[in-house]
Each structure stands twice: as C-alpha cells, then as structure tokens.
C-alpha cells in the first residue's frame, strides 16, 4: 500500500505539468499527425512494417541461439544425431589411409571398439592415467594426403584403430 501511495504522489505532479504544457505548445503539421496517431491508436503502415522487421530479426537471432523453432527453422539437433555426424566428420577427415604417427615409434595393439572416434578416445584415456605430460614424439597427426603420408601408409597397418603412440624411453 505504501509503495502505491508513493507512486501516486510521484506521478501526480508529472501529469499536471504535462497537461499544462500541452495547452501552451503550438504544434506543427508533423507533430499534430504524430499526436493524433498516438491518441487515436491508428498505426502508420510504414512505421509498423519497420517495427515488424526489427522485431523479426531480433526474434530470429534470439530463437536461433536458443534452439527454438521459428518459421520453419528446425531446432538444434539431438545429441545422438550430433554424435553420429561428428563420427562421420572424423571418418571423412581420416579418409582411407587412417592415422599417421609423427616419428618412428609405432605400436600395434588390439582394440575392442574400432568405431570412428575410438583411437582418439582411447588415447585421451591413456593420457589421463599418466602423471607426466606427453612429449612431442607421442603426438598423433591426421593424414591429410601429403607425400610423406603416402610413403608411411605402405608400412603402416590399414586399420586406424590399431595404431597407438608408444611412450618414449629415456
């Protein structure tokens, strides 16, 4: 009740001053049209179109970021489909040659899962178990079709899931 009384006391003088000022002002032709439009509630078509365009663009930006559907735009895909697409991208990057390892150390191991991201997942898990950071010889590079990869692919096994970096010995 007290905030309502304070609000009424603040608004009262403001309303009385604006009604007095309105009588004293002389309006031009443009000002009168704006006042009558605002008082009657009849919108001007060109202004309404511009406001709608502004509102649409901001709405589209917001809902696009939030993943909601706006006028035929599909929401963000589920995690399952995104995972499948990520695996597909990894397969496309690897191509038919698989992985190449920098340096001369190679180790063939049998892995249970030979899916598209199995090597990367297993190498991350093996690095988490170590207390020391990996050195430059343990760096795994993707083959992107260079001449060096053509020579090393003849010696390396065809299955990319069997290639793991060997820890260096001091």
UniProtKB/Swiss-Prot annotation:
Q: Where in the cell is it found?
A: Secreted
Xref: InterPro entries: Tachy_Neuro_lke_CS
Source species, domain of life: Eukaryota
Q: In the record, which residues are listed under signal peptide?
A: 1-16
Q: Which UniProt keywords apply?
A: Amidation, Cleavage on pair of basic residues, Hypotensive agent, Mast cell degranulation, Secreted, Signal
Query: Propeptide per record: which residue ranges?
Result: 17-54, 67-170
Q: Does the keyword Repressor apply?
A: no
Cite a GO CC annotation: extracellular space
Report the principal subcellular site.
secreted
Q: One GO molecular function term? A: receptor ligand activity
Q: Record keywords: Signal included?
A: yes
Q: Positions modified as Methionine amide?
A: 66
List every stretch annotated Disordered: 107-170
Q: Which PROSITE patterns match?
A: TACHYKININ
Q: Name one GO biological process term.
A: mast cell degranulation
Biased composition regions of type Polar residues, renumbered to the chain = 123-140
- Family statement: Belongs to the tachykinin family.
- Function per UniProt: Tachykinins are active peptides which excite neurons, evoke behavioral responses, are potent vasodilators and secretagogues, and contract (directly or indirectly) many smooth muscles. Hemokinin induces plasma extravasation, mast cell degranulation, muscle contraction, salivary secretion and scratching behavior. Increases sperm motility. Induces potent analgesic effects and may play a role in pain modulation. Promotes survival of bone marrow B lineage cells and of cultured LPS-stimulated pre-B cells and may act as an autocrine factor required for B-cell survival and proliferation.
The molecule here is called: Tachykinin-4
Source organism of this protein record: Rattus norvegicus
